[in-house]
Amino acid sequence: MNMLLEINDLNSYDIEFIFDTAIQHFNNSNVSNNSLYGKTIVNLFFESSTRTLSSFEISAKSLGAHTVTINVSTSSMNKGESIIDTVLNINAMNPDLIIIRSQYSQFIKEISKYLPNCHIINAGDGHHEHPTQALIDYCTIRYIKGKIHNLNISICGDILHSRVARSNIRLLSRYGANISIVAPPTLICNLKGVSHIHHNFVEGISDSDVIMLLRLQKERMTNFTISSEEEYAYLYMLNYENLSYARSDVIVMHPGPTNKGVEISHYVAEKKSIILLQVKMGVAVRKAILEYLLCHKLVKDMGNIT
């Protein structure tokens, strides 16, 4: 595998390797190795990021790679250079891998056509996909629950604008999860792999094994999709009271950033969620992805083990 642009780029072997390797890293998070020594990884983020960018940088450095993060606000794009020329110039410097985030859906897939021999990771493109976040959530759920098959997973919030929702639905439904999406009618879209659509929040989370919350992406909203944050919170915020309708061992997830008091109460975020565990798993999973893309010999040798 040369690139990770979409969840469907991964087959079952790819996912199993990433899961097994990620859990090894997760259980040995204080242990560094030099599996990527001598590799150069460029982070090229055209959209703001805290967790994803930091997670990739920490993952790469802990594996011995050299990282270069391009500050787009001070790059030659401010002098009129096009995005494609920026990417082509960076690629001409022969980095081993480029990690790209863009506000434009499908942009990274289009860019990849100009870079057939370069390793590329999609760190999120518009509302299209965020494959590494879906892998993090998959690994987190499987780590805690021991499986994905037949779990009732409720994804709640701004489905319409969410790349995380799309990638998660594609991945988790492949492994047999029963996925419900829960949102106002104006924030819903038809997605393959969804079992149920709910506009009533309590109905949507009833009997859930996993509740995955998503923030309102106001920066992507071009039409009048909600009347107010206050009304949205009244109808769709997960709080102490409505959490009781889910299963007693439910896990509450959020890819971040959270808007406490809107989609999740302070109490649930701080006392009942596994948000920080997801962040920790994020470093482990991204280590595994980097190794899978860049350590070809390691993967080949593992594939020959009988």
UniProtKB/Swiss-Prot annotation:
It catalyses: carbamoyl phosphate + L-aspartate = N-carbamoyl-L-aspartate + phosphate + H(+). InterPro entries: Asp/Orn_carbamoyltranf_P-bd, Asp/Orn_carbamoylTrfase, Asp/Orn_carbamoylTrfase_sf, Asp_carbamoyltransf, Asp_carbamoyltransf_Asp/Orn-bd. L-aspartate binds at residues 79, 163, 215. Pathway: Pyrimidine metabolism; UMP biosynthesis via de novo pathway; (S)-dihydroorotate from bicarbonate: step 2/3. GO terms for cellular component: cytosol. Pfam families: OTCace (PF00185), OTCace_N (PF02729). GO terms for molecular function: amino acid binding; aspartate carbamoyltransferase activity. Keywords: Pyrimidine biosynthesis, Transferase. Its EC number is 2.1.3.2. It is an enzyme of class 2 (transferase). Carbamoyl phosphate binds at residues 51-52, 101, 130, 133, 256-257. GO terms for biological process: 'de novo' pyrimidine nucleobase biosynthetic process; 'de novo' UMP biosynthetic process; amino acid metabolic process. Heterododecamer (2C3:3R2) of six catalytic PyrB chains organized as two trimers (C3), and six regulatory PyrI chains organized as three dimers (R2). PANTHER family: ASPARTATE CARBAMOYLTRANSFERASE, ORNITHINE CARBAMOYLTRANSFERASE, MITOCHONDRIAL. Catalyzes the condensation of carbamoyl phosphate and aspartate to form carbamoyl aspartate and inorganic phosphate, the committed step in the de novo pyrimidine nucleotide biosynthesis pathway. NCBIfam families: asp_carb_tr, PRK00856.1. Belongs to the aspartate/ornithine carbamoyltransferase superfamily. ATCase family. This is Aspartate carbamoyltransferase catalytic subunit. It comes from Ehrlichia ruminantium (strain Welgevonden). The lineage of its organism: Bacteria, Pseudomonadati, Pseudomonadota, Alphaproteobacteria, Rickettsiales.
